[in-house]
């Protein structure tokens, strides 16, 4: 099974991906982990793209992240299931704040600043991004699932792991 997980900042992409990966023994690639170093400085795409291409050759995978410049068309074509997490702003904001605290306790430099908060609450939900998700849903209707509530997310992951 190949699953592409996309969605808003703080929507639970990493949680969903890890939960399924651990229970179904499916390798998982978090695009943020290859796109940025430990201080959240971007790594050049020429270094990243071969890693993503190689990962997509696996028989089963979960790729988590909405980075369009990292082979989005190829990921969506190869995916058996596309999951788009569009949870409410308040839920996402609380998760972003919780993640900041957890990362700081793990010794990572915080990626949370005014610009990032503004992006998480408004930028990743702008008209262009909403159109992007709508286009994916229309183009890949038969294999796309849009989840907008925590209950829908939990129901989905249970349906996969059961």
Could you describe each region identified by the protein language model?
Residues 5:
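Hydrophobic anchor at the beta1->P-loop junction of P-loop NTPases
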Residues 23, 124-162:
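NTP-dependent small-molecule kinase module
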Residues 2:
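Walker A (P-loop) ATP-phosphate-binding motif of ABC ATPase nucleotide-binding domains
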Residues 86-128, 132:
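A glycine- and Lys/Arg-enriched "phosphate-lid" helix/loop adjacent to the NTP-binding pocket
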Residues 14:
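Walker A/P-loop
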Residues 27-81:
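Conserved nucleotide-sensing/catalytic segment adjacent to the nucleotide-binding pocket
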Residues 9:
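The conserved Walker
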């Amino acid at each position: 099974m190949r699953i592409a997980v996309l969605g808003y900042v703080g929507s639970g992409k990493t949680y969903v991906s890890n939960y399924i990966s651990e229970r179904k023994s499916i390798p998982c690639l978090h695009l943020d982990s290859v796109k940025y170093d430990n201080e959240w400085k971007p790594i050049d795409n020429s270094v990243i793209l071969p890693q993503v291409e190689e990962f997509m050759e696996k028989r089963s995978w979960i790729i988590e992240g909405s980075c369009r410049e990292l082979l989005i068309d190829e990921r969506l074509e190869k995916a058996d299931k596309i999951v788009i997490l569009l949870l409410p702003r308040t839920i996402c904001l609380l998760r972003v704040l919780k993640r900041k605290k957890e990362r700081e306790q793990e010794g990572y430099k915080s990626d949370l600043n005014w610009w990032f908060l503004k992006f998480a609450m408004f930028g990743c939900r702008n008209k262009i991004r909403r159109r992007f998700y709508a286009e994916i849903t229309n183009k890949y209707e038969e294999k796309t699932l849009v989840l907008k509530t925590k209950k829908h997310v939990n129901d989905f992951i249970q349906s996969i792991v059961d």
